[in-house]
């Protein structure tokens, strides 16, 4: 499964690399798990509603979520900082 980062999500990821390596490790673990099983597993996967319909979120920390969408052959990371 191909991994695609939105501009915002890549900026989020770079922010975590500079400020908190533990969160980067957690994000990497969640992405690895999501590539294997997109709709179940670590981080309590949850389908989003309304204007984010089609996207899913997984908990990174109490405050931050990984927001993503899955297509046939790719995983689009939309955000990995703050809530949706």
Curated annotation (Swiss-Prot):
The keyword Hydrolase applies. GO terms for molecular function: endonuclease activity; RNA binding. SUPFAM superfamilies: RelE-like (SSF143011). It comes from the Bacteria. The keyword Nuclease applies. Keywords: Endonuclease, Hydrolase, Nuclease, Repressor, RNA-binding, Toxin-antitoxin system, Transcription, Transcription regulation. The active site is at 46 (proton acceptor), 83 (proton donor). Its EC number is 3.1.-.-. Gene3D superfamilies: RelE-like. It is an enzyme of class 3 (hydrolase). Disruption phenotype: Deletion of the tomB-hha operon causes reduced infection of the mouse bladder but not of the kidney. GO terms for biological process: global gene silencing by mRNA cleavage; RNA catabolic process. Forms a complex with antitoxin YefM, in which the toxin is inactive. Toxic component of a type II toxin-antitoxin (TA) system. It has been proposed to be an mRNA interferase but also an inhibitor of translation initiation. Has an in vitro RNase activity and preferentially cleaves at the 3'-end of purine ribonucleotides. YefM binds to the promoter region of the yefM-yeoB operon to repress transcription, YeoB acts as a corepressor. Belongs to the YoeB family. This is Toxin YoeB. It comes from Escherichia coli O6:H1 (strain CFT073 / ATCC 700928 / UPEC). The gene is yoeB.
């Amino acid at each position: 499964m191909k991994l695609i980062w939105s501009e915002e999500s890549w900026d989020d990821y770079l922010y975590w690399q500079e400020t908190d390596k533990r969160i980067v490790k957690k994000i990497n673990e969640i992405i690895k798990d999501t590539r294997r099983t997109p709709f179940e597993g670590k981080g309590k996967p949850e389908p989003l509603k309304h204007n984010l319909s089609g996207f899913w979120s997984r908990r990174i920390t109490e405050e931050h979520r990984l927001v993503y969408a899955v297509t046939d052959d790719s995983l689009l990371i939309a955000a990995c900082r703050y809530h949706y």
